Amino acid sequence: MEQASATTTVDVLIVGGGIGGLTLAGICKKLGITYKVLERSAEITPVGAGISLAPNCLRILEQLGHLDFIRRKGQPLRKIQIFRNSTPWSLVDYDWVQEKFGYSVYSIERHSMHQVLYQGAGPEHVLLDAEVVDIEDVPTAPSVQVRLADGRQLAGQLVVGADGIRSATRRILAATQGLEGANTIRFTGRTHMTGYTHPLQHLGPADLGVATWVFYDDSILTSWPCIDNRQWFVGVKSSELKNPTRSSWKNATQAIINDVYGDRFHPFGEHHRVRDVVNLAERVTASDVFEETTFPAMACGRVALVGDSAHSMTSFIGQGACQAIEDAGELANALHAYFASQSPSPQMLRERLEEYRHRREARARYVFSFSSLFAQLHTGRLWSPMGPLLRWVAFVCAPMWCWHRALTPLYGYQPVVHALVDAPHAN
């Protein structure tokens, strides 16, 4: 990794080397905008299990040249089989998504997708072990100053916070505006236990692309199809908050997950048990799930936010990464308009970021509300005590046009980076 000097100056400083930050970095690279990604971790290691990439983010990833990789290493969703305990409820067709929106919904290993974005951004532009502790945006100054925990100083024409649900950028930004310097997230009362498996050798071609939702009496478990009949499973159960300062558990194991789900029914288990799937996991994780309570301004002065740093939401509709990618694309349009100007100025930059803010905030609120509503429906808590009945009506009785109508605003919105529309789609 490149080491920053005390006077490092670039166009854009991106705080956070996750999906959103690296996507923005890759776009900046193609647009000729200089950038530096500041990642607090000391190394890039496998984290998480799977990731969902839906049509609303795939046009941007195609512009970056990543669609061929996604098609090779990801699995398009074809069907969803739904069970109540071990009783079949319905089989939902999902092939229509490709036909209607031009892209399927893909499940792919998170780490492999992260590595592709990392290489696309350029490791030489990523500073590891770079924890941001202060951001100074003085309106009359020519640049925004960033200070790291080890004392290094960096400067950029703007700073982008892409540092996740417990965003340091957001806390610093709030404090500079005289607001409480804390993220406004709340615990949802749910713990997610997830894993990504080796191929399930007993499954066949007919099982490829088939997702599974199982509604148990006291919890739920979904599994998403990945390449070669691998499974990305997500168990959801009610729980007490273990640590208010972090989301991920430090020591998640297969045994912990099997204690909760092991003896439960799963149609893809070799013996129709969840443990048959969990025991084939390459890695597992567990996390307490938080979501946003108050939406911050997605830009203030010369500082902007993308992804979970601005609008963390539940993962039930698989839109966390998709929304971060949408943000990155829309922000890149604002940045290109600024840097391509004949007479750029700090005031013009603030105006471009304000336009970005207004474009993205309404969309983020819509997707957040959709995700929250779907989570309540999925867990049988929507309009409680009517929740279980409403869930049955939605997933057993509702005709396909209901799915089309619900998902069209979500998947039909497909932003692009305007300056890359005619560019060849290659890394």
From Swiss-Prot:
Entries under Gene3D superfamilies matching the protein:
FAD/NAD(P)-binding domain (3.50.50.60)
Record-linked InterPro entries: FAD-bd, FAD-dep_Monooxygenase_BioMet, FAD/NAD-bd_sf
Keywords for this protein: FAD, Flavoprotein, Monooxygenase, Oxidoreductase
Any Pfam family the entry gives: FAD_binding_3
Q: Does the keyword Flavoprotein apply?
A: yes
Pathway-wise, it operates in: Secondary metabolite biosynthesis
UniProt-annotated binding residues for FAD:
39, 110, 308, 321
Q: Which cofactor does it need?
A: FAD
The role this protein plays is:
The subsequent chain release by Dieckmann condensation (DKC) could be catalyzed by the TE domain present at the C-terminus of pyvA and/or the alpha/beta hydrolase pyvD, installing the tetramic acid moiety.
What's the protein called, per UniProt? FAD-dependent monooxygenase pyvC
Native source species: Aspergillus violaceofuscus (strain CBS 115571)
